[in-house]
Amino acid sequence: MCNCQDFCRSLIRVFLVVALAVGGPPVQGAEVTLAQAVLALEASLAANPVAKAAGANATMRYAEGLVASALAVFEQSRHLDKPYFHRSEGIDGRAGLYNPDNLYSTALVTDQGRYRIRGRRGSHVMLTLQTLDTYPNVGLGRNLSVIDLDAMGIKPGESFELLLGGARQADRWVPLPAGTRALLARQTFSDWEQQTPTTLSIERLDREAPRLDSSVPWRTAADYLQASERTWNEGYLPMIQRLPENRLLPPRASDTGTGGLGGQQSVMARYRLRSDQALLIKVRKSDARYQGIQLGDPWFVTPNYVDHQVSLTSAQAVIDADGYLRFVISLTDPGVANWLDPAGFAEGYVFMRWQGLARPLADDEAPTAELVDLADLSARLPATTRRVTQDERNDQLLRRQWVPIRRLP
């Protein structure tokens, strides 16, 4: 069971330090509301059975991630007249199973505002912009629209401008749907070593936003924590815990009604393994612009994906001669190239994604899963399966240091 009360109290002090840095403490009552939200989060995590399965360290990182996101929302909500893209940072602890193959950047906006986005397109495989009716990760908000910047003909290396909101413009203009509160930019990479990121900036073109009462950002941060606790700990986690263990359901379109990316198909499953077992996943290499698989811990959080090979794209993985990708999930290294390392978690989640498909996946393209004894794994794999030595495994991990998050200027 995680006892993170001292940690949570220290987070309250962090918020107070921020308040002093930006021009004085919060108004009376705002601090109490935030303190209550942080301590309520601590109590919720400590009482949740998931804390036992995840362990104290993972639970602490999860709490850190939620509060760090609240701090980002606090800061952004102070600057609605001068918005900016906030890049999600860190390599673990972020709620909602962040995809290691994506760079996520968020900006807070209003549906009545007019904005200009400037950027220079990188060479990564996909670039989308979603309009959401809630702050990202505050809840499973609705995905109001998806803007595919690649469909606008923006090529790698090209500088571009995009106008949002207000009256219709002649070129590269998109409306902001009623209820829009945030933009989520998503850059998807299939080759971490070779592909480059897109640079993005945003400015507000219309009148300045109304001056906020000084308590609003604080209450917004408190609302974030309270909504996150309801969304993940009380809502989403109990739902996905009902998924069958070690079995894959058919691919489905992502639910844009809960903030998912439109045009994506996905498979989510639970795994549970003993130390002498492996889960063998077999899937056909598709013609999707992006195809990837990743693991999540019991909190539905991506483990440290730099020091552990918790994810692979179809470009990173070895494709067998029959056109299939075979991934092995096991607590110990089985010596195959396509090992997915659960980072010590004996139970957790598997998530597979296909983006940019020319057509929906056919029934025979659905992935399969087989639970096997580690001693029998070799017999279940093709004779030509790529094996790796410890030095080669170390080299794989060394190459993962070229994560997109470290390649931004």
Model-identified regions with their sequence ranges:
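A compositional/structural signature for long, glycine/proline-rich flexible linkers
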Residues: 28-409
